[in-house]
A protein has these predicted regions:
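Acidic, low-complexity, intrinsically disordered interaction modules
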Residues: 17-54
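Short, flexible coil/linker elements and helix-boundary hinge sites characteristic
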Residues: 6, 10, 24-27, 58-59
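Amphipathic, interaction-prone secondary-structure segments
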Residues: 10, 15-18
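Conserved short beta-strand edge segments in small beta-sheet-based binding/regulatory domains
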Residues: 29-33, 56-68
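Short glycine-/aliphatic-rich beta-strand segments at the starts of folded cytosolic domains
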Residues: 1-11, 38
Length: 68
């Protein structure tokens, strides 16, 4: 599994809801840490899909690391 953080600057609630629904469909766990950061937990292929998906919002996925 991989853990990562998504930076969600200047997002509306609809943007977060769209990312959340994508995660739910692809078996990715996502947690809102605060107004800017979201923590995600996913298998490597799904994390890659998420990275491609959030790029369309001009968002970034950073600090990806292995989780035991």
């Amino acid at each position: 599994m991989l853990s990562g953080k998504i930076v969600l600057y200047e997002t509306s609630k609809d943007d977060f809801d769209e990312v959340k629904s994508f995660c739910d469909l692809n078996d990715i766990q996502i947690y809102r840490l605060d107004m800017i950061w979201c923590k995600v937990l996913a298998k490597p292929k799904r994390m890659y899909k998420l990275m491609k998906f959030v790029r369309k919002f001009d968002r970034k996925v950073i600090n990806i690391e292995l989780v035991d």
